[in-house]
Amino acid sequence: MLKTIQDKARHRTRPLWAWLKLLWQRIDEDNMTTLAGNLAYVSLLSLVPLVAVVFALFAAFPMFSDVSIQLRHFIFANFLPATGDVIQRYIEQFVANSNKMTAVGACGLIVTALLLMYSIDSALNTIWRSKRARPKIYSFAVYWMILTLGPLLAGASLAISAYLLSLRWASDLNTVIDNVLRIFPLLLSWISFWLLYSIVPTIRVPNRDAIVGAFVAALLFEAGKKGFALYITMFPSYQLIYGVLAVIPILFVWVYWTWCIVLLGAEITVTLGEYRKLKQAAEQEEDDEP
């Protein structure tokens, strides 16, 4: 009887092991960690230009002046663990200096910010192994829409949330609202990854695969934030070695780790569909055998 139970358990776990083997094979073939390193490098170069463009958009709309402060604190508190305050202070200084640039310099900032989006597009389509290329004008329109509408939609959502919290009837729902706010970063990460895996690839991505891959990436991202913050707090080796410059390697390691998570979610999304196709092909071969 024990042998029968073991055989059943082995039969049920066999598809999981086959899928994990396929996932590891694709990660190795796509050089996922190298892609993550490239994206981390481009992200660090594009970080200040991207933030400068986003805050310039908020400055163009006076109604978002208060919301931009809330959005800024939300981003640094939830997406840059442990050293968010220090990084925020430095980036705000850099952005303030960039406001003194000429029109040519401002165009350079925008091009650098768009370069990050192009790199993300290229990396994800490499993982999906897509040969189809978008028209350049269409790609530019998509990048520009993300760059402009993304921050405005995020600001609008925070403004609506602040308005709802200010209503009298909301005072009776403080506990519920607190619980929702705790999981809001996870939901935001999940939705962001889902949109990334669904829209950026130039081939059709099954919606359920994108949802699963995005959920795993969101969970890893939230766990990574807490784990990274705990590591920096419990083992302050970077502060001991680099002193006041510790924020630089800490930021680089965190950005690299984040891109590893993003690309791993993409690999999971791709592998789910790939495994399903291989399984269907194997079943078809078995049916065709006499």
Curated annotation (Swiss-Prot):
Task: Classify the protein's membrane topology as the record does.
Answer: Multi-pass membrane protein
Keyword terms of this UniProt record: Cell inner membrane, Cell membrane, Membrane, Transmembrane, Transmembrane helix
Q: Where are the transmembrane segments?
A: 44-64, 104-124, 140-160, 183-203, 210-230, 244-264
Instruction: Tell where it localizes.
Output: Cell inner membrane
Q: Pfam families in the record, alphabetically?
A: Virul_fac_BrkB (PF03631)
Question: Can you supply one Gene Ontology CC term for this chain's record?
Answer: plasma membrane
Give the family, as the similarity comment puts it.
Answer: Belongs to the UPF0761 family.
Q: What is the recorded name of this protein?
A: UPF0761 membrane protein YihY
* Organism per entry: Escherichia coli O1:K1 / APEC
List the gene name.
yihY
